[in-house]
Amino acid sequence: MKVTILFNRSEGYEEYPGANIEAELPKKRRRKKKTDVEAISDALRALGHEPSLLAVDGRPQTLTRIARSSADLYVNLVESYGGDDTKEMHFAAFLDLVGKRFTGASAEASLLAMDKSIAKMIVRFHGLYTPYAAVVYRGRVEHAQDIQFPVIVKPANEDASKGIDAGAVVSSIKELMERIAYVHDEFDCPALLEEYIEGREIYAAILGNERPEALPLVELDLSKLPEGMPHIAGYEVKFDVRTEAYRRTKSAPARDLDEETTERIQAAALTAYQALKLRDYGRIDLRLAESGRVYVIEANPNPWLDPAAEFAMAAKEGGRSYNEVIGEIVEMAMRR
């Protein structure tokens, strides 16, 4: 079967902090491993498919090329268009409009996951806990009376931890107003104010459609972050390999959780996955509070499929090889 992997070029990210981090590092500290695109391509080839690569940038010629192409399936790794992350849903809609079969989230699911305030309302409607929140537009505040400090302030319509760093957690009105202004000015979108939940950062990988399966849980251990730094999975922690925060954190299977707690977390993740209409594969980020309560933080459609990332880590813990996971995602997309 002919399978085309669609992925992003770097154009449009040159001005974003961390865009060229790898190039800035000494050679001995650069990561020597395959990219997710290369790993997926190798897996597809091992499974007997004919993979090809097509980089997506902001040029209309690229869309024309996709529309005229004739692969049996497209592995959609595209998270932006022309450097604009809010266009992720539009790209999925484009693939639908031109009749291409593709893996992962639909345009609708991408929209629901991207708009964190809507996602929160949906998961709360389905009986799940999520931190109290308010959306702050320029000039007005809604429901802020329900929130108590400390508060984490995020861009309401961004992903990949953009706009989330140590300064995102605030403890006073002055800090709150300054952070809201920062989000409005830097990201040109509403600010999401969210009750800060102290606890463990748990990732639940989900695989499937009609009967989705929760894979073994993975934890991002934030306990060794520098003193005074809030325990959040911010941009420095996840992506900036130059920082102490990055070096002090790591993800690993959450093997110390008891069976009852594991089942509660997986059940919440499965409910959120289906409520937000994710398909094929996804990841739900949760917080296990010190009280034992499970909070849904956000959904990640089309999570990173790097062999060393949390999704593949969860699959491996459950007995699946990387190639098997890629094969299952391909099969599910073809059955839809």
What are these regions (language model features)?
Residues 173-267, 290-295:
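Phosphate-binding site of ATP-dependent enzymes
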Residues 58, 171-172, 321:
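Alpha-helix N-cap recognition
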Residues 51, 101-102, 130, 151, ...:
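Hydrophobic beta-strand scaffold residues
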Residues 122-124, 256-336:
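ATP-dependent carboxylate activation and anion-phosphoryl transfer catalytic cores
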Residues 1-6, 66-68, 110-192, 197-200, ...:
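Active-site nucleotide/adenylate-binding loops and adjacent lid/helix of ATP-dependent enzymes
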Residues 12-17, 159-162, 242-245, 308:
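Short acidic/His/Gly/Ser-rich catalytic and metal-binding motifs that mark active-site loops
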Residues 151, 208, 298-301:
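Short beta-strand elements
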Residues 1-101, 108, 113-114, 137-143, ...:
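ATP-binding N-terminal substructure of ATP-dependent carboxylate-amine bond-forming enzymes
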